[in-house]
């Protein structure tokens, strides 16, 4: 009931049956629709907001069954915890001007996911760590906006992401078998990445009266918003992080180096490779006309709305560092 619990929601849709029941249910033999229903899906979801704590929690569970081969895909739970933007250094009782560190804001999003694909008669025989795909991810962006020389808005941002895995897969090439082989280590594995950016923008205003309409009360307002941003991140395929490795694949006399991540294919993707050092330039234009109508009321009409152009330069790129305009 939304009125009884305005900060929480619950929903459920259940359509579940074991494959053995489907095969032995006499009623289904005479029900062509039931017999032709190859997939059954069930879902349950719950969410709750805590406005005073700037916190929200949502959780769901999903089951998808394929009756023909008795396979089942289960995700339980898939839970997200979100902390909306807070200013941890802001004083409760401010005196005087706002301090620079009071502008720093923090957000948090955490997600836990646990899933498996198996046969329905084997579901409860599976090991939680070895057979289920599970993990947790934390995302923490920290940012602030400052005014520089009265006219420039400066926004530094730092993004931090951390993943928790329960397995690490080392790969190699087996010459005798002629295929890739895996060596899996189970336990707690922590993987993180980070990036930083700095954005600067300002606004330039222009007002003028059209030369061809001097007798009418018409004004044109032109707003130009130039911006420049810098973003950087290290190469997380580097050996100093320990997230990636490589092996030599020797097949049909052709030797190739294969790079891979120990944590590829899991519920949360590992950090991407490649060093980043991007400088971006952008100009946005807005043009509007203000005039008096027949009733002497002032009206505004947008002539150009957010006409933008931009270009970027990747300082870490060896080939084609400039983007298209």
Where are these regions (language model features)?
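Outer-membrane beta-barrel proteins and related beta-barrel translocases across Gram-negative bacteria
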Residues: 1-325
């Amino acid at each position: 009931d939304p009125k009884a619990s305005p900060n929480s929601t619950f929903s459920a849709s259940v359509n579940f049956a074991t494959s053995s029941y489907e095969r032995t249910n006499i009623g289904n033999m005479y029900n062509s629709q039931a017999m032709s229903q190859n997939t059954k899906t069930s879902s349950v979801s719950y969410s709750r907001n805590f406005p005073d704590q700037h916190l929200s929690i949502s959780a769901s569970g999903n089951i998808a069954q394929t009756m023909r081969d008795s396979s089942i895909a289960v995700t339980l739970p898939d839970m997200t915890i979100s902390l909306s933007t807070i200013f941890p250094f802001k004083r409760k009782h401010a005196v005087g001007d706002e301090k620079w560190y009071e502008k720093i804001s923090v957000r948090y999003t955490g997600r836990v996911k646990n899933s498996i694909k198996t046969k329905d008669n084997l579901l409860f025989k599976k090991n939680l760590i070895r057979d289920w795909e599970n993990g947790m991810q934390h995302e923490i962006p920290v940012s602030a906006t400052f005014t520089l020389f009265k006219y420039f808005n400066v926004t530094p941002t730092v993004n931090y992401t951390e993943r928790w895995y329960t397995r690490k897969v080392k790969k190699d090439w087996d010459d005798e078998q002629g295929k890739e082989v895996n060596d899996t280590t189970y336990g707690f594995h922590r993987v993180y990445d980070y990036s930083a950016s700095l954005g600067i923008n300002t606004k330039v205003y222009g007002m003028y009266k059209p030369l061809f309409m001097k007798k009418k009360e018409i004004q044109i307002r032109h707003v130009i918003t130039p911006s420049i941003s810098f973003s950087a991140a290290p190469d997380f395929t580097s050996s100093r992080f320990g997230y990636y490795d490589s092996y030599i694949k020797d097949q049909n006399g052709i030797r190739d180096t294969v790079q891979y991540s120990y944590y590829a294919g899991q519920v949360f993707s590992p950090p991407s490779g490649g060093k980043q050092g991007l400088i971006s330039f952008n100009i946005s234009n807005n043009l509007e006309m203000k005039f008096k109508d027949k009733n002497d009321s002032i009206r505004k009409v947008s002539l150009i709305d957010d006409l933008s152009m931009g270009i970027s330069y990747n300082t870490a790129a060896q080939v084609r560092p400039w983007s298209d305009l």
